[in-house]
């Protein structure tokens, strides 16, 4: 159920401007695309994004450019007094309605002290659950391909704050494109590399 709510929340902005999907259709889209979303999350989380390290920001910019460009977005680098912003624009393939959906994401993260993470690498997605002693125990992430427990959690640096929302958007976008349900509106995404 949480997968459906999560996926539905991400699809909501698209659905405001496009054809409505019922619960059965949302369930189907979730089943078809959640694994691709998890794979993308693992790929994106694996790239360090410490805002204080210039090379991390450059790598994050390249990663975001690739992720959006591969989906048909045109990217523009917006220079600022500091770190540039990226503006990703998707022009609808259908007849343009005249409206634009504008979204904002930040892709940077805070410094990380690996010794304070209870896993080998903070930039690796790890599946965990609470043990009887209330400690987090690591599970085989492949369990997600065959089962689901609402008490499981994914751990990885910037998973819930910076990178997770971007992956949710891209996964929802992919799902709607695959079903030919994408909005007839222009979509603009501001990606802040140093919030």
Task: Locate predicted features.
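Carbohydrate-associated surface elements
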Residues: 169
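Residue-level micro-sites within transmembrane alpha helices that shape
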Residues: 2, 160-162
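Bacterial Sec-dependent N-terminal signal peptides
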Residues: 1-20
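Acidic/His- and Gly-rich active-site-bordering loop/insert found
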Residues: 20-159, 166, 176-186
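Acidic, glycine-rich active-site loops and adjacent beta-strand->loop/helix elements
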Residues: 107-109, 190-195
